[in-house]
């Protein structure tokens, strides 16, 4: 099996990458260095993770003509944050990311969420009651500004994150440069079968974030299911002499889904890439997919009147009100 997906541009995108969300400064630089040393050639970043300058230091120390790893052999993704959807803000935001990452171009640039927050330099602009200040910028206008970055050679490909099927088609209806990738939450409890099929039919590759169920999130629910303790996955792990995490990553990559598990632990970073030396049988693949229960771990929430509620559900571009 190939260890890469092929984008509609013809460019290869490694099926396994290092996620960097929640990797705090002070630890993320070393994690990226360990990943590159372990054979990773795909790093997923975003300015909202507040660690791009440190990732840039890791790139500076490991990549270059005299460093052993060539820039063109590493696939680097970053994302446009919600406060930067205004067409005038798109290029400056990318240039800041490039400066922080110490790169001349990105392999992939994604619109992080379909909805916009109020313009400015406050990442989460809020009203006095704690609710967020939104903007109604149409993401199709944002997309047109993203397309210009390709023409300028600043990004090799552009794509979407957290968009639903209807929103993808909305972008495709106006795109002169098509999105190549959709990055969404996906794991056995949220298998995204319909959305994956929707993407395939339209030439998009899917990337799965929080592929292990994001066990280190801030807003965990006490009753939520724990993916890594799922008995069906434990049984497969035992059979193949692998960890539950490796079984889950293998399931994703075997169905052609790019997977970006986050870790700052050297042993886990190494373990997560050791998934290309075995193959799940087709009924085992189906067994894992059948664990789907529509469980979304990543729904940004806020507390209103003492209750935890979805933060952005009232926005007209909120993606999770549609079936997929």
Swiss-Prot record:
One MF term in the entry's GO annotations: aldose reductase (NADPH) activity
Active site positions, chain numbering: 49
Name of the protein in question: Aldo-keto reductase family 1 member A1-B
Family annotation (Gene3D superfamilies): NADP-dependent oxidoreductase domain
Gene, per the UniProt record: akr1a1b
Keywords tagged on the record: Cell membrane, Cytoplasm, Membrane, NADP, Oxidoreductase
Catalytic activity annotation: a primary alcohol + NADP(+) = an aldehyde + NADPH + H(+); S-nitroso-CoA + NADPH + H(+) = sulfinamide-CoA + NADP(+); S-nitrosoglutathione + NADPH + H(+) = S-(hydroxysulfenamide)glutathione + NADP(+)
A GO-annotated cellular component: cytosol
Family listed: Belongs to the aldo/keto reductase family.
Lowers pKa of active site Tyr, annotated site positions: 79
Protein EC: 1.1.1.2, 1.6.-.-
EC top class named in words: oxidoreductase
Coiled coil location: none
Purpose of the protein: Catalyzes the NADPH-dependent reduction of a wide variety of carbonyl-containing compounds to their corresponding alcohols. Displays enzymatic activity towards endogenous metabolites such as aromatic and aliphatic aldehydes, ketones, monosaccharides and bile acids. Acts as an aldehyde-detoxification enzyme. Also acts as an inhibitor of protein S-nitrosylation by mediating degradation of S-nitroso-coenzyme A (S-nitroso-CoA), a cofactor required to S-nitrosylate proteins. Also acts as a S-nitroso-glutathione reductase by catalyzing the NADPH-dependent reduction of S-nitrosoglutathione.
Species for this entry: Danio rerio
């Amino acid at each position: 099996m190939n260890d890469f997906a092929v984008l509609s541009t013809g460019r290869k995108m490694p099926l396994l990458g290092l996620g960097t969300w929640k990797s705090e400064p002070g630890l993320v630089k070393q994690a990226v260095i360990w990943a590159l040393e372990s054979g990773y050639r795909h790093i997923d970043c975003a300015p909202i993770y507040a660690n791009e300058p440190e990732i840039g230091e890791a790139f500076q120390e490991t990549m270059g003509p005299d460093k052993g790893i060539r820039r063109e052999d590493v696939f680097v993704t970053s994302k446009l944050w919600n406060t930067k959807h205004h067409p005038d803000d798109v290029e400056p935001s990318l240039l800041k990311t490039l400066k922080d990452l110490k790169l001349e171009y990105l392999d992939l640039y994604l619109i992080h969420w379909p909805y916009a927050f109020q313009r400015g330099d406050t990442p989460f602009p809020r009203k006095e009651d704690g609710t967020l200040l939104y903007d109604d910028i149409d993401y199709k206008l944002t997309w047109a500004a993203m397309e210009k970055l390709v023409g300028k050679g600043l990004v090799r490909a552009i794509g979407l994150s957290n968009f639903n099927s209807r929103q993808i088609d909305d972008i495709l209806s106006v795109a002169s440069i098509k999105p190549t990738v959709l990055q969404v939450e996906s794991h056995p409890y949220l298998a995204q079968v319909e959305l994956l099929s929707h993407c395939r039919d339209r030439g998009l590759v899917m990337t799965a974030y929080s592929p292990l169920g994001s066990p280190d999130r801030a807003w965990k629910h006490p009753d939520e299911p724990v993916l890594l303790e799922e008995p069906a996955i434990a049984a497969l792990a035992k059979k193949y002499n692998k960890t539950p995490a490796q079984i889950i990553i293998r399931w994703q990559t075997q169905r052609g889904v790019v997977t970006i598990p986050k870790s700052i632990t050297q042993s886990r970073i190494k373990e997560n890439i050791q998934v290309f030396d075995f193959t799940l049988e087709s009924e085992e693949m189906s067994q894992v997919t059948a664990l789907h229960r529509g469980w979304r771990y990543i729904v940004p929430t806020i507390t209103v009147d003492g209750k935890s509620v979805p933060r952005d559900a009232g926005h007209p571009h909120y993606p999770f009100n549609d079936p997929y």
